[in-house]
Amino acid sequence: MANHRIDRVGMEIKREVNDILQKKVRDPRVQGVTITEVQMQGDLSLAKVYYTIMSDLASDNQKAQTGLEKATGTIKRELGKQLTMYKIPDLVFEKDNSIAYGNKIDQLLRDLDNKS
């Protein structure tokens, strides 16, 4: 039963953080950032927020990470306004490499298909 609550809170945080990034955060470094997944710690005190960015450049990835870290306070404050929780979890932002990995696999499969 508790796992359902953890999953629901994670989904709600994902939706709200995406909304906050689009509407409230004006930092150009976080433009184009999309939240892909939120993993909650069992006691709901920590949320690992995985994000992706359209650009593959390392400098853009670093800028996005820095921008998200700087905006953490704003995001957490806005989450406090939107969520009915006793304590808003601490946010840790990590780059989600699964999309790039999937694109790499897709490219390898296309290359194999073209060779045969």
Swiss-Prot record:
Its main location: cytoplasm. It comes from the Bacteria. Keywords: Cytoplasm, Ribosome biogenesis. The keyword Cytoplasm applies. One of its GO terms (molecular function) is ribosomal small subunit binding. GO terms for cellular component: cytosol. One of its GO terms (biological process) is maturation of SSU-rRNA. It is found in: Cytoplasm. One of several proteins that assist in the late maturation steps of the functional core of the 30S ribosomal subunit. Associates with free 30S ribosomal subunits (but not with 30S subunits that are part of 70S ribosomes or polysomes). Required for efficient processing of 16S rRNA. May interact with the 5'-terminal helix region of 16S rRNA. Monomer. Binds 30S ribosomal subunits, but not 50S ribosomal subunits or 70S ribosomes. Belongs to the RbfA family. This is Ribosome-binding factor A. The gene is rbfA.
